[in-house]
Each structure stands twice: as structure tokens, then as C-alpha cells.
């Protein structure tokens, strides 16, 4: 169970022992649950890796670097002269000299010589690319464009929004066409959460250079305001005539809808349009049917390009929820191209909208754009085309190909970092090693990860193949000896359970969340106590939640409980496991008519839960195919969700 809230799951069981679980609304609920056998032992079978004193000092150095504590980092690094990860020791020593305590780049020259020496010594490594990323932020802050440009050309990952904004600032300072740069910025300036100082400088300068209109700048600022970054919003676009409407819509969109209906005529056509877009977004996130009306008013006025990425996406969702296919089509056609292509959802729903209009040939073209993707919408697109959703033919690799992976430097370093529970650094090393691998090499690397029980790396690595696949690696079934009897005893679908675990923890036994969920099934402590009591697990304490069998027992039973509580719907139960059963019931209650499961999933208000449900159901479909070797229908699994009055639940 995960961050947004505690989670839950239930499923019917024919005949068996009955749990004394009485929901206030329905006593019969208790008769749907079968009491499971309890784990034989609470003791974890996993042996803790040996951590040396030097390792502990290294971990302390990492923490000092995170805090940009220059003195502490220098002190610890001086005692790790012969430590095996000499590059990390050097990086953790140098990095605090480049950033202040708040995390901002210092913009001075004090660390330059050390950075250059580091980049030369560790050229071509993952950590050198990380160091270059950091230095680019420093170079950008001090407007050292010649050096910035030289280093930016060597930045391999190029995944930092601020660095991209500095790259555009560099081009602007050198006289490149501001209109072209403004167009290029549209694919960068999508999420204000990542803007930082660089992007806040870029937008006003593009306006001053004539490349961007004041209205476009205000739209970018408004996107920041929608997310609560009001100071940033003013820096980006200046004063916005609809600032108060944005604030009101966030607080009470229904009231704002009523009020603006009376006062809209006081505003310009442009400001009316963007205001209706903002109001529509926040109504849609409340699943208010008036969202469709608000967006229709915006559509009539135009100015789609001035809506934030968030508003553009929720415009589609509002249309889907209302079954307003004309709005769905218009919303997708009016999207920023960068927003439209980043998620296959919009290609799929555009195809569906075309199909409603009778444009079958064009609909088919859209489905074919994504039918080679092995994800939620790729599966749905294949079904629209009448194609199979069966797992592709398996490509096998030989032992010799797998053996060669053991000597790969990135994998060896990654293993040691994982042993110290430094997953971020371990993933960096592992993923860097995967660059430029062929499909067969990726499968060999995934098999190697399986040998050493790094199941999250099995999934991550096998997931990268393009033409040659092995879905038994993409969708592995570790801990099957433990999980199968638990699921069988309570009649819980094994493929769905694996699909959920794959999403929850990627099979990392000691996975933990910031809110306290832990283990393979990310069970919250309070939920664990509740379930343990209901199934008769005596003497349970939360320190036993780290035991694999205990975690699987409690998580599976909770999943089963929410499934029963939510009438056997995998979509609703998956949502409940992530966000809580009360929320899932509320989202169902707000439907105005029976709705296909795919639309329900796409219109879940919480981003985390929306992504979660789609991934769990997609995973479950492929797990079922891998386990049974038969074609599977994702549409059937999604089913239809009918509106139903939300009843109180005892479940956490």
C-alpha cells in the first residue's frame, strides 16, 4: 500500500472459514472472506550484507554532500583515501563546493579546477556525466556561455530542465532567432516544478527579444500559479488579470464556475477563454460534470495554446468523463505538440474520437502509431485493431552471454552500492552500463540480474528491448512458492497480485515509502495491524512486516478485502489499494452513467493513482499471458464501472 493513502483489496471465496469482519453497512461482507493459513515464521530469511566502518563513513559522506556541507564532506573524504569508490569520494567532496546550503549553484570559480580534473580522470563514466550536469548549472548561473556550450555538447543524459533553459539562454545571448527559440522552449517549459532560476530568466528575456508574446509568458506563469508557485508565476509572466480566478478555482471550483458565469463579460475574450480553461481543470479534478461545460465555453472562445499542459490534458479527461467525443477530439487537436506526443493516451483517445465520427481509416492510423507499445494504451490499441494481446515470442540467451555480464564494471559497482542500500547510485551505475546494448545483450543482463536476485533490475533491463523480447523477464514471478499458496487459499488472482507487486515495489524486499509503507506489497503499519487482527494472526507486531511471507500474507488479504468491498472490480480495487477504499467509492459515486473502465482509470483525479491503476491492470494482463500462454483482453479486465452511492467502509 502506498503514499496517497492506505490501500485495500478483497475477493469472493466459495465456502470456508469466516472472518469476523462486519462492515457497518453490510454484515454479509464477513462471509466473503476465507481465513488464510499464517506464515510459519516471522523471521526474515534475507541475510543483511556486511557493511564495514569505511562503508558507513562513505554513507555519511554522501549525506554531507546532499546537504552541501563543505567542511564535513572534506573531513570525511580525507579519511577515505583508499576506498574502492574513489570517484564517488571525489564527487561527494567537490559537489558541496558548487552549491549553497539551499541547493542553488554558487556561480563562482572556486571548484572549477577540481571539476575539470575529475571530468578528465573519470571521462565516459556515469558519475562524470552527473558532475557535468552539476557544473553546467554553475556555468549557466554565471553566464559563462562559451564553456557552457562546450560542456553541454558532452552531456549524455541531457535530462535536466534547468540545463535546457540555460542552453536556450546561451543561444539567445549569441543572437539566435528568438522566435525559433521560443518555439523550442515549448517542449521544455511544461512543468513549473522543474523550472528553477534558469527557466524563470528565460521567459522574460524571450518576451523582451520579441520571440514570445506577453500572453504566452502569462500562460507559462499561470501554469506555475496553478501548481501553487505564485512568486514564480509573477517572475515568468508578470501580473495576470485572472490571478484571483486561478486562486478561487483551486479553492472552490464549483463556486468559481457559478461566479464567473455571472462576471465573465467583464473580461477580454482571451482572458475569458483561459479562465474557463482553469475552472474546467479544477472542476474536472473534482469529477464535477460542469467541467465539460466550462471547457466547451473555452473551446468556443479559442486560445487553446494558452492553456497549461495540465489544463489541456484535463480538457480531454473532462470530455471522456462526459462522453463528449467532439470535445475529446478538439482538445487533443489543440494540444501543445510536446504534450500530445509524451503520452500514448492522447493518440489512443484521438483514434477513439475519430472512430465515433465514422472516420475508421484515420482512427486505424492512430491506433497503429502505438500498437507496438507494450503498455496500457498499446494493449488497448491492439484490441481496437483486432490484434492479439498475447506476450510476444520469447528470445532466449545462452549461459555464456549471461556469464559475460558478471564482469561488466557498472554491474559490479551497482551490486556493491545496492548492498549498502544506495539504490539511487546503484541504479545510475547499472543503467549507464545498459547504454547502447542490443536487445540480446539486454536480455542477458536481465538474466544476470535474475541470477543475483536483483529483480527490479530484471524488470528495468528487460523492459528496454525493442524487437527481441522475453516477457518472463519483464514480468517475473519471484517468491512464487510463498505467494501462490496464499493467493490460492483466498481465491485471489495470482496474475493481478503480481501485477500489483511489480508496480508497488518492483520486488525489492526492503522497499519503503516516505509515509511508512514497506515490503513487497508496500503495506502500511496501521493496515497491517488491521488485517492481522481480522485474519487471526496473533502476536503480530509491525517489526514482522519486513518478513517476506508475512508481508505477502497481509498485503494479499488486504487486496482481497478491498476487492470484495468494491464489488469485484479490479479497477476500483487497484485504485483503493493505492488511494484508499473511501476515495475509490467516491470516484465511482460521481459517475453520471455506466462508464468503461479505461475512461474511469484515465479520469482518476490523483496522478499517482491514475498511473498506478493503468500500470497494474496492464501488468496483470501480461502476467496472465505469460502464466497461461493465452490471448488476453485488457478491455474485459477493465470492464464497466457503474455509478453507486458510496457507503462507509471499515477498511483503512
Predicted regions and their residues:
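Structural motif corresponding to the intra-repeat A-B loop/turn of tetratricopeptide repeats
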Residues: 67, 100, 138, 142, ...
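Alpha-helical repeat scaffolds
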Residues: 72-76, 105-120, 145-155, 178-191, ...
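Residue-level signature for tetratricopeptide repeat
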Residues: 63, 92, 96, 138, ...
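Catalytic glycan-binding domains that act on GlcNAc-containing polysaccharides
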Residues: 82-83, 91, 263, 270-272, ...
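N-terminal leader/linker segments that initiate helical-solenoid repeat arrays
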Residues: 30-92, 99-101, 391-411, 419
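Bacterial N-terminal signal peptides
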Residues: 15-24
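Bacterial N-terminal signal peptides that target proteins for export
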Residues: 3-14
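Generic helix N-cap/helix-start motif at coil->alpha-helix transitions
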Residues: 49-57, 68-69, 82-90, 109-111, ...
Amino acid at each position: 500500500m502506498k503514499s496517497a493513502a492506505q490501500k485495500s483489496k478483497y475477493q469472493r471465496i466459495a465456502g470456508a472459514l469466516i472472518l469476523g469482519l462486519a462492515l457497518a453497512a453490510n454484515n454479509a461482507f464477513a462471509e466473503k472472506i476465507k481465513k488464510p493459513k499464517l506464515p510459519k515464521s516471522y523471521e526474515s530469511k534475507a541475510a543483511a550484507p556486511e557493511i564495514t566502518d569505511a562503508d558507513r563513513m562513505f554513507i555519511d559522506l554522501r549525506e554531507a554532500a546532499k546537504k552541501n556541507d563543505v567542511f564535513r564532506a572534506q573531513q570525511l573524504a580525507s579519511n577515505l583515501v583508499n576506498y574502492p569508490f574513489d570517484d564517488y569520494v571525489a564527487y561527494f567532496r567537490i559537489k558541496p563546493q558548487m552549491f549553497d546550503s539551499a541547493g542553488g549553484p554558487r556561480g563562482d570559480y572556486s571548484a572549477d579546477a577540481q571539476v575539470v580534473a575529475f571530468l578528465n580522470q573519470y571521462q565516459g563514466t556515469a558519475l562524470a556525466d552527473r558532475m557535468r550536469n552539476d557544473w553546467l548549472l554553475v556555468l549557466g548561473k554565471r553566464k559563462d556561455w562559451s564553456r557552457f556550450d562546450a560542456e553541454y555538447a558532452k552531456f549524455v543524459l541531457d535530462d535536466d530542465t534547468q540545463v535546457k533553459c540555460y542552453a536556450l539562454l546561451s543561444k539567445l545571448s549569441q543572437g539566435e532567432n528568438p522566435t525559433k527559440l521560443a518555439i523550442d522552449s515549448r517542449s521544455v517549459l511544461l512543468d513549473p516544478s522543474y523550472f528553477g532560476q534558469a527557466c524563470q530568466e528565460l521567459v522574460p528575456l524571450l518576451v523582451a527579444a520579441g520571440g514570445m508574446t506577453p500572453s504566452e509568458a502569462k500562460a507559462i506563469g499561470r501554469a506555475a500559479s496553478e501548481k501553487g508557485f505564485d512568486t514564480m508565476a509573477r517572475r515568468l509572466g508578470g501580473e495576470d488579470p485572472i490571478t484571483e480566478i486561478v486562486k478561487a478555482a483551486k479553492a472552490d471550483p464549483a463556486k468559481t464556475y457559478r461566479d464567473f458565469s455571472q462576471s465573465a463579460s467583464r473580461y477580454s475574450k482571451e482572458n475569458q477563454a483561459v479562465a474557463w480553461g482553469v475552472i474546467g481543470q479544477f472542476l474536472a479534478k473534482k469529477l464535477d460534470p460542469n467541467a465539460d461545460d466550462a471547457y466547451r465555453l473555452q473551446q468556443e472562445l479559442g486560445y487553446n495554446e494558452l492553456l497549461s499542459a495540465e489544463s489541456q490534458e484535463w480538457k480531454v479527461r473532462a470530455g471522456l468523463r462526459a462522453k463528449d467525443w467532439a470535445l475529446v477530439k478538439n482538445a487533443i487537436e489543440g494540444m501543445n505538440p510536446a504534450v500530445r506526443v509524451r503520452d500514448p493516451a492522447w493518440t489512443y483517445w484521438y483514434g477513439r474520437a475519430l472512430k465515433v465520427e465514422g472516420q475508421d481509416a484515420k482512427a486505424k492510423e492512430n491506433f497503429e502509431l502505438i500498437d507496438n507499445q507494450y503498455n496500457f494504451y498499446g494493449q488497448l490499441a491492439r484490441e481496437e485493431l483486432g490484434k492479439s494481446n498475447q506476450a510476444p515470442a520469447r528470445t532466449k540467451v545462452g549461459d555464456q552471454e549471461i556469464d559475460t555480464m558478471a564482469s561488466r564494471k557498472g554491474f559490479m559497482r551497482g551490486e556493491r552500492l545496492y548492498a549498502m542500500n544506495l539504490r539511487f547510485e546503484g541504479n545510475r551505475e547499472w543503467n549507464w552500463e545498459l547504454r547502447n546494448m542490443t536487445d540480446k545483450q539486454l536480455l542477458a543482463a536481465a538474466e544476470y540480474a535474475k541470477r543475483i536476485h536483483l529483480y527490479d533490475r530484471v524488470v528495468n533491463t528487460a523492459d528496454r528491448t525493442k524487437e527481441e523480447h522475453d516477457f518472463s523477464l519483464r514480468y517475473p514471478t519471484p517468491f512464487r512458492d510463498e505467494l501462490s499458496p496464499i493467493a490460492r487459499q483466498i481465491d485471489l488472482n495470482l496474475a493481478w497480485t503480481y501485477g500489483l507487486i511489480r508496480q508497488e515495489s518492483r520486488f525489492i524486499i526492503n522497499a519503503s515509502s516516505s509515509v511508512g509503507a514497506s515490503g513487497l506489497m508496500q503495506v502500511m503499519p496501521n493496515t497491517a495491524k488491521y488485517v492481522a487482527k481480522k485474519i487471526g494472526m496473533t502476536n503480530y507486531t509491525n517489526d514482522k512486516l519486513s518478513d517476506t511471507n508475512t508481508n505477502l500474507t497481509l498485503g494479499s488479504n488486504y487486496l482481497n478485502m478491498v476487492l470484495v468491498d468494491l464489488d469485484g472490480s479490479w479497477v476500483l480495487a487497484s485504485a483503493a489499494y493505492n488511494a484508499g477504499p473511501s476515495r475509490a467509492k467516491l470516484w465511482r459515486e460521481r459517475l453520471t452513467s455506466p462508464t468503461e473502465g479505461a475512461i474511469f482509470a484515465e479520469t482518476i483525479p490523483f496522478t499517482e493513482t491514475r498511473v498506478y491503476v493503468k500500470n497494474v491492470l496492464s501488468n496483470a494482463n501480461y502476467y496472465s499471458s505469460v502464466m497461461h500462454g493465452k490471448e488476453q483482453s485488457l478491455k474485459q479486465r477493465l470492464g464497466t464501472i457503474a455509478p453507486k452511492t458510496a457507503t462507509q467502509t471499515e477498511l483503512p
